[in-house]
Amino acid sequence: MGQTKEIITTLLPLLVLFLIFYFLIVRPQRQQQKKHKEMIEGLTKGDKIVTQGGLIVEVLKAEANFFSVKLNDDTTAKLSKNYVAFKLDEETTPNNN
């Protein structure tokens, strides 16, 4: 009975630290990754996105691992889905004034 109590008192602080680590770091990061993945899967033609390089582009076509994007009126490119930072909403679109 004494050994069991010693093991519990030894492992309890480690368990508490693990739970704190999980709820403060791991869980929020997983939720953010899930939200980002859903955003990428929901992108359609005409959506404006910002790449991780800072370019603002318009989605022309969604493929399995890439997007065909329009950089300007006469330039198109393919962008890996891994490099999409976020989607521009109407409220966050920068003004050209």
From Swiss-Prot:
It comes from the Bacteria. The keyword Zinc does not apply. It is found in: Cell inner membrane. Its main location: membrane. GO terms for biological process: protein transport. SMART domains: YajC. The chain crosses the membrane at residues 6-26. Keywords: Cell inner membrane, Cell membrane, Membrane, Protein transport, Translocation, Transmembrane, Transmembrane helix, Transport. Pfam families: YajC (PF02699). GO terms for cellular component: plasma membrane. The SecYEG-SecDF-YajC-YidC holo-translocon (HTL) protein secretase/insertase is a supercomplex required for protein secretion, insertion of proteins into membranes, and assembly of membrane protein complexes. While the SecYEG complex is essential for assembly of a number of proteins and complexes, the SecDF-YajC-YidC subcomplex facilitates these functions. Belongs to the YajC family. Part of the SecDF-YidC-YajC translocase complex. The SecDF-YidC-YajC translocase forms a supercomplex with SecYEG, called the holo-translocon (HTL). This is Sec translocon accessory complex subunit YajC.
